[in-house]
Amino acid sequence: MVQSDSPEELAQRAKPAWRLQQMPVQLSNFVSKTPLIGSEWPPTGDWRSANNNSLGDWNKCCVPGSEIPQHLGPFGNSSLTMLTAQQPGEKIHPDGGYVSPKEDGRKSSEHTNSYDVSASQSPSNDGAQSDSTSDEHIDVECMTETEMDTDEKDSTIKPEDQATPKLEEGSDSKPESTSVEGTSSNYQVTSEPVQMPQMPIPVIPSFLKNSLPAPIPITPTQSANVERSNSPSIEEALLLTLSQQQFAEVFAEAAKIRKSSSESIGFQRSGTSAFLNIEPKEMSMSSANNNNEEAPASTVSACSTPTTTTSASFCRPPGLGPVALPPTQNGQTPMLVCPICGFMCPSKFHFNSHMNTHGDHQCSMCDYTSRTEGRLKKHMRESHTVEEQLRAGFESEPAKESASSPKNLSLSKDGSATSPINEIFNLSTTMASILDSTNNAVSSTSTTEQPSALSALTLDMSSTPSLLSTLAHSSFGVSALDQIKAISENPSFMPEGGINLASALGVVSNAIKGDTPSPEKQSNGECRRSSSGKIKIFKCKQCGHQSLSKDDQWAHARTHIPAEKQLNCQHCNFVTEYKHHLEYHYRNHIGSKPFQCKKCAYNCVNKSMLNSHMKSHTNHYQFRCMDCTYATKYCHSLKLHLKKYNHRRVPEGIEMSGGDSSPPFTSDATITFSPLMKQEIKTETVEPVTSIAQPFPFNPMMGNHGLNFANHMLLNKHLDVGLMGLRNSVMSPLKCSACDFVASSADEKMRHSMSHILNSSNVPTSIASLYNSLNLPSFSHVAPDNDNALESMDCDVKIDDDNITESHCYEEMDQGSDSAVSPTGSSQISSGDEETKKCKSLSLEQISARANGNNSPMSNDSAMEKDGESADDAPHSPSDTTSVPSPPLHSSSIVAPIPITPQPNEFLQSILAQASLLGPLLANRPSAFYCDHCKIPFDTQQVLDSHMRFHTPGNPFMCSDCQYQAFNELSFALHMYQARHQ
C-alpha cells in the first residue's frame, strides 16, 4: 500500500519540476563529457570541478527503478491479492511539456506491470466476442484509495455532485494505458474525448489466456472525501466508455472468482508474469482445452488442499475389524482391505498372500480346500462343469491352455488332432486301465447300468512290458479275452478317431519295441513365464546351475547322467535315467492320466501325485514349524518356509495338535510322545563310566526341597524333584535372565521363559536328552543338610493323562542299552564282589523318601537285600541277555547311569533357578483362579481377567486382540507366547 504524499513533499517535488521545465530536454546536453574512471580523478582538488558533469545533470538523467509490486500476502491468509502498478503522484497539466524523471519512471513501471497483469488474466476464453466485449479486460479499477487520493490532491477541487463512476479494486481486466501514450516525455492529455474504438488492443498470447486465473477482487469501498481533478485520467476516460451491461459482466466475473477463491486453501497465483513458470504441465493441459470452456482456478494444484501420500506398501490401521476403503484419487490403485483384521495394501498379490494366513479356501461345490485362491479357481474351472460353476456363482474366463496341454492333444468327437502324435496315438490310459474299464463295462451290461465316461478311454502308447504281463496275468474277475471281446463288440469302448483294437495293440507293441515313428522333436527353448509374469528359472538339483528353458535344463542334465544310462524322449529333448520318469513323461505327451481322484475330476500320471492331491480334501496339517504357528499339508511348503525365515521344523517324534485329524489333547497334556519316542527313551545307549567324580555333571541338589520345573519345560508335565535349596541363589523373579523383559507376575514370567525354550535351537527329542541338557547352576554356598546329598534324584515322568508312571529312568536306560553299567546290570561285573553290589543305586522308595526329607525306612541290610533281588531279576531282562560286559569299575561311588560332558547353558540354569522359586507357589495356588479353556491356574483374579480378555466369547481359541484362530489350547498358548500383546 503506497502512502499519500504530504504537502511538503508535493511542494518539494513541484519545485524541481518547475526548474526542469526551463532546461532543454535533449539528453546529450545533460551528458556532454565522458566521466572520469579510476586514476583519471585528480588526487587533490574539488571533485565537483574535476567531474565532467554536475550533480544536477546526473539527477536529470537518473531514472528511478520501478517499484516491484508485492505478490504474496501474509502467510495465514487464505488467498493472496495482487497489487497493481502505482499511479503517478503528480497531476499532469496539459501545458506541461516536460515530465519529471521520477514520474516518467513510474509510468514505465506502470506500463510494464499493467501489461503483464492484463496479459496473464483472462477468465473468459471466448474468442468470438466483439471488440466491445473485449473491453471488459481493460482494468481501470486496480488503484487503491491511497493512490487515488495522491493523484487527486490539487488546488482545483472537483465538485462532489459531478457524476463520477464508482471504482472497484481487483477487477478481472487491466488497462493498456500506455497504448495511447506517445513518448514518455512528450505525452499530453488533451481536452478532446477519447475514442475507445480507435485504441489498439494488445495481442495476448493464447497460453496466457487459458492458463492463469484472474486475481481475487476486493470489495469496493467508497471514500467520503474523494477528490477528483478537473481533467480525468486515462483510466477514468476509458471507464466512461463502458456500458452498463459491460459493468454487470465484470461484476459477475468478479463474483465467480471470489467464490472459487474462498473455497480454496493455500497459495494461489496472483496472475503476474512472476508466476508463469509454475506448473507448466497444468498450463499445457489447460491451453489445450476448448476455448468456450472456462478455466477454473481450482485446477491449480497450489490452491488445493495438500493430500498426504505414503510410499509404504502396507499400512495397518489402528484398532481391529474392517476399515473403510479410502477413495481413489488421481487414478491411483484402490487399497485392498482385509475384512478380518483390517490389513490394507494396494497390491493384489500381497493381499492374497495375507489372506492365505487366515485359513483355507474351500470349494463351494465339493470339499476341496486350498491355501491359495488361484488353486481354488483352477480346481473349480477344471473339476466342475459350467452348469455347476454358474449354479455356485463362479464366473471366470476359460483357462488359457498351452500348446503342450493334454487337452489340446486329445481328440474330440467332432474334430481330429493336428499333431502327428495324436493322429497315430489317440491314447489316454494304460492297458491296465483299459482292462479295468472293460471289466466295469461287462459288469454294467448285466445290471443294465449305463457305463459312465467309458467312451473317452483310449490306449497308452507309452505302455511297457509290465503292462502286457498284466494283460496276460490279469487278476480281474473277467478274463482278458472276455474284456477284449467286450471292447470289440461295443465300439463305444474303443478309442476315438477310427483306431481299432488290433491297431491300438500294434501301436503299443511298436512303442515297446522302440519302432514308433517319431515326428520332429518339439522345441522347448523358449523362456517360460509364471502367472505373475516373471521368467521361470529351472534349477539343477545336483548343482547350482540355472537354466531359462527346458532344453537348456535337459542339455545340462546330460552332464550328470552317464551316456549308457540316458533315456531320451523321441518327441522332445527330455532325458532321464529312470524308466518310470520316462513313462510319466510320455503320458504327459499324450494326455494319459490314469490316476483319478474319487472326490473330484482331478487326474494325474502317477500315484504319488494323487496322494499329494488327496491332502487337499483333508484338513490335517502334519508339517509344522516350531518357531511359529505355520502349518502345512505338504513337506515341500514347509521346507520353503523354513528356508525363507530360518525357522526349525517340529521333530517327528513330537506330534503337536492341529487340524481335524489330530488327536484331541486332554486337560493337562500339550505334547504327546509317540511310541517311537518312547522306544527311543528305552533304547538310548549309555557310555561306560570311567570317571570317579560326581555322578552328575552338575553339583548335587538338596534332598529335602522340591522343584517343579517340568511343569514349564514340558508344558504342564512336571518332575517331582526337590530343588528348593536354590531359593537364595537366583536373581529377581520378575526379570528374565536371557533378555531385558520384566514380567508383571510370576505366570507371565514363566510363559516368557517358555517362549525362549521353544525358540531355542537345541530342542531335546527325548526325555533322557532333555534331562541331560538341563545343566543346573553351581550353588556352592548352599550347605547340605545331610550326608545323602550325593544321591541321585527321582526323574519319574508323567506322560499319559491316566497318571501311569513310567519306570525309573535309570532302569529304562539299562533295559535298552548295550552296556552293563546300571543298577540291574552291575551284577554281571563280579558276582563275588560285595563292594560292587553296594555301589548300585538305591531303590525308588529310598530316593523318594530322601527327596521328601525323611530318613530311609530301611536299614542297610534291607537295602542290600533289595539290591540283591534286583540283581537276581536282572538276567531275566532282555537287555541283560544281549548286553556287552563293561570294563571294570574303578570306584564304588558311581551312581548315575547317564554321565555327560558338562555343557554350560546359562539360560537353562536361570530357568531352573527361577522355576525353583515358583514351585511352591504353583503347587499352592488356589483353584478359584483357573482358566477353563487353557487349563491353566493363575495367582490372582486380576491376572486371570487379563488372560481371559484374549479369549473371544463364543470362540475361546480365537485371539480377541489380533483375530488369530487357534486349533486348540496348545496352539493358542503358543500364540500367546510368541505374540507380544499388551
Swiss-Prot record:
Biased composition (Basic and acidic residues): 101-110, 153-175, 863-875
InterPro entries: Znf_C2H2_sf, Znf_C2H2_type
GO biological process, one term: regulation of development, heterochronic
Family annotation (SMART domains): ZnF_C2H2
UniProt-annotated location(s): Nucleus
Tissues in which the protein is found: Expressed primarily in ectodermal cells during embryonic and larval development.
This protein's UniProt keywords: Developmental protein, DNA-binding, Metal-binding, Nucleus, Repeat, Zinc, Zinc-finger
Effect of loss of the gene: RNAi-mediated knockdown results in premature alae formation at the L3 larval stage. This phenotype is partially suppressed in a sea-2 bp283 mutant background.
Highest taxon of source: Eukaryota
Impact noted for substituting residue 83 to M: In mg285; causes precocious hypodermal seam cell fusion and adult alae production in larval stages L3 and L4
Biased amino acid composition, Polar residues: 111-132, 176-193, 816-831, 843-862
UniProt biased composition (Acidic residues): 142-152
A cellular component annotation (GO) from this entry: nucleus
Chain positions covered by the region annotation Disordered: 87-194, 377-415, 811-896
Pfam families documented for this protein: zf-C2H2
GO molecular function: DNA-binding transcription factor activity, RNA polymerase II-specific; RNA polymerase II transcription regulatory region sequence-specific DNA binding; zinc ion binding
Zinc finger (C2H2-type) boundaries: 336-358, 361-384, 538-560, 567-589, 595-617, 623-647, 734-756, 929-951, 957-981
Gene3D superfamilies: Classic Zinc Finger
Function: Required for the late stages of development. Plays a role in the developmental timing of postembryonic hypodermal seam cell fusion events and adult alae production.
Family named by the database record: Belongs to the hunchback C2H2-type zinc-finger protein family.
Name of the molecule in the record: Hunchback-like protein
Species this chain originates from: Caenorhabditis elegans
Gene that this polypeptide is encoded by: hbl-1
